[in-house]
């Protein structure tokens, strides 16, 4: 049960909210990009702390705040994570070379031999969100990951959802052990983090009209 109050924390009743103009908010949200090329400079602990100081404000069911984060603070640790993902992929190839993880793994292993990181895209930092398996709403972790991506964007830090990392940490005991994720914890997802190597364009990407069923 959350310690901050389930209905209306006293501090919230006294808070002063600054107005955020609609145009500024829309511009911020629409200019978010998935970053897949990073500078090698890792994010400082100060920058990471500032990002997660915003992330902690993500809403959770009953204000339980169940999300725990595992964050690699330097490129060396992140490279160890990449190597462990490759180990998992080799295991998948050995077990069933026709499975989807094996087919994807063969391609990523070949890229790694060429010196290309196709798994975490050379990002110097990574973050994994976990919640207790006993928590009824693992979606809280996904919401927190979305806050992470947006908080990073607000500070000029690039982020991208780490699908390969998420798959590996959910299925490979060796990686879970390295990340100190317990058996009673559910992995909600992961993201790569770092300063963009190329400044993203400020133009809005094309999107299809939103699919809405009006009742």
PLM regions and their residue ranges:
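Iron-sulfur cluster-binding cysteine motifs and their immediate structural context
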Residues: 1-8
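Extended interfacial segments that mediate partner engagement and assembly in macromolecular machines
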Residues: 10, 14-49
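C-terminal helix-cap and adjacent tail motif
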Residues: 13-19, 110-114, 186-215
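Small-aliphatic-rich amphipathic alpha-helix that forms the alpha element of a beta-alpha
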Residues: 50-55, 125-127, 131-177, 191
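Short loop-to-beta-strand entry elements in the cores of soluble alpha/beta enzymes
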Residues: 64-73, 164
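Short, surface-exposed beta-edge/turn micro-motifs
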Residues: 66-67, 123-126, 187-188
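Glycine/small-residue-rich phosphate/adenosyl-binding loop
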Residues: 71-141
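A glycine-rich helix N-cap at a beta->alpha junction
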Residues: 89-102, 177-203
């Amino acid at each position: 049960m959350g310690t901050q109050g389930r209905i209306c924390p006293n501090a919230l009743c006294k808070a002063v909210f600054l107005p955020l103009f609609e145009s500024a908010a829309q511009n911020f949200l629409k200019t978010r990009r998935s970053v897949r090329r990073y500078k090698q400079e890792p994010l400082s602990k100060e920058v990471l702390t500032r990002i997660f100081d915003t992330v902690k404000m993500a809403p959770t069911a009953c204000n339980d705040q169940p999300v725990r984060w595992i964050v690699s603070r330097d490129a060396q640790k992140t490279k160890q994570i990449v190597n462990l993902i490759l180990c998992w992929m080799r295991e998948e190839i050995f077990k069933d070379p026709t499975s989807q993880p094996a087919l994807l793994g063969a391609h990523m292993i070949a890229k790694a031999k060429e010196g290309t990181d196709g798994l975490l895209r050379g990002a110097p930092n990574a973050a994994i969100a976990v919640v207790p398996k006993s928590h009824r709403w693992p979606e809280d972790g996904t919401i927190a990951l979305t806050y992470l991506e947006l908080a990073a964007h607000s500070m000029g830090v690039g982020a991208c959802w780490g699908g390969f990392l998420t798959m590996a940490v959910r299925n490979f005991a060796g990686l879970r052990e390295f990340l100190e994720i317990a058996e009673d914890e559910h992995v909600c997802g992961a993201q790569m983090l770092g300063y963009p190597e190329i400044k993203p364009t400020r133009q809005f990407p094309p999107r299809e009209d939103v699919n809405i069923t009006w009742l």
